């Protein structure tokens, strides 16, 4: 696996890999603020009474949902590629009845709906220290990320987080800017070409089996899965449920069949039953594959990651 390969470059996803999202209450507050900016932008363009008479909060939610729905539609039409987000916004506005919507308005509305990274994301505690250690050990570091927003504001946001101390922005592959999204191999090659690295010399770290692991495996990039903490917790609950069920069934069976033939000590020992295998990364992977089987069914390639880690700092025991 690792010992058979000369890895000199490590690529990272961003969301749920290097950072996590703020709590839901704060997210909704940030969303509301940007929604209201979008409403102001719209009302400065049109005096349509249907919109001007609508409560600002309601109109803001309507705008966001309409744009997000149109983006999802565009993504389904051309899998593996990002839609033209401005054009998509114009189409969403036109569907709402704003027939005069143009690219200028679409661009302004779409930008107004952006939620900035420093306010809405938090780096994991071990992110910067792990990146610093890997860089010190001589690894080339890169980013391959699916994002609806890129451009100058995203560059500024990454500067604020401190991540640009470890990544060269011009060598990142950001789907909103590149026009291609994971798992399309082209977005990985975009980053690798800029970093002057061959696929077999690279590793990819990410939280998504379909986007990160599948995309990496299509190019023979070493794939490292860092599942979300919430997913790991969900799988542990499922494992505990199966453990308790198996234990309870065994106890019931033992008691029913042998209670009349054993003394108290023998009965207590028999009631323990066989302890199921402990929670492992293999169980976690099997749980996710079973849960998401329908979504992953069309995939013809083996999606099993080469490595599974819980925390980013676990990479330091590997590289």
Language model features: what each stretch is:
Residues 24-42:
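Basic, amphipathic juxtamembrane/active-site segments
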Residues 36, 86-91, 152, 186:
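A generic alpha-helix surface/boundary motif
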Residues 5, 78-90, 103-104, 111-142:
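Short, acidic loop-to-helix structural element flanking the phosphoryl-transfer center
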Residues 2, 22-26, 30, 77-81, ...:
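Conserved aromatic-histidine-acidic binding/catalytic patches
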Residues 40, 50-111:
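A metal-dependent, Asp-based hydrolase signature
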Residues 1-10, 20-22, 45, 51-54, ...:
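Asp-based, Mg2+/Mn2+-dependent phosphohydrolase catalytic module
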Residues 16:
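Receiver (REC) domain active-site loop signature in two-component systems and cognate sites
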Residues 13:
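Conserved catalytic-loop position in the HRD/HxD motif
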């Amino acid at each position: 696996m690792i010992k058979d390969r000369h890895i000199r470059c490590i690529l990272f996803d961003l969301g749920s890999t290097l950072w996590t999202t703020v709590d839901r209450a704060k997210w909704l507050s940030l969303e509301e603020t940007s929604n209201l900016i979008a409403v102001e932008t719209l009302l400065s363009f049109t005096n349509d009474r249907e919109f001007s008479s609508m409560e600002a909060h309601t109109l803001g939610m309507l705008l966001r949902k309409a744009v997000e729905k149109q983006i999802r539609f565009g993504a389904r039409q051309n899998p593996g590629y990002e839609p033209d987000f401005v054009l998509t916004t114009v189409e969403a506005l036109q569907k709402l009845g704003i027939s005069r919507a143009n690219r200028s308005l679409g661009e302004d509305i779409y930008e107004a709906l952006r939620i900035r990274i420093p306010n809405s994301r938090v780096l994991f505690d071990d992110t910067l220290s792990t990146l610093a250690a890997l860089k010190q050990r001589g690894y080339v570091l890169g980013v391959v990320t699916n994002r609806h927003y890129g451009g100058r504001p995203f560059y500024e946001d990454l500067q604020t987080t401190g991540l640009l101390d470890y990544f060269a922005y011009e060598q990142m592959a950001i789907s909103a800017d590149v026009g291609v999204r994971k798992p399309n191999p082209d977005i990985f090659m975009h980053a690798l070409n800029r970093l002057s690295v061959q696929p077999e010399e690279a590793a990819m770290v990410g939280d998504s089996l379909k986007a990160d692991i599948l995309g990496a495996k299509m190019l023979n990039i070493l794939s490292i899965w860092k599942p979300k903490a919430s997913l790991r917790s969900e799988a542990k609950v499922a494992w505990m449920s199966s453990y308790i069920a198996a234990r309870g069934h065994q106890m019931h069976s033992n008691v029913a069949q042998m209670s009349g033939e054993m003394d108290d000590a023998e009965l207590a020992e028999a009631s323990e039953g066989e302890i199921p295998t402990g929670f492992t990364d293999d169980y976690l992977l099997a749980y996710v594959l079973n849960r998401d089987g329908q979504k992953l069914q069309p995939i013809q390639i083996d999606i099993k990651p080469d490595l599974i880690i819980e925390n980013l700092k676990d990479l330091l025991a590997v590289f």
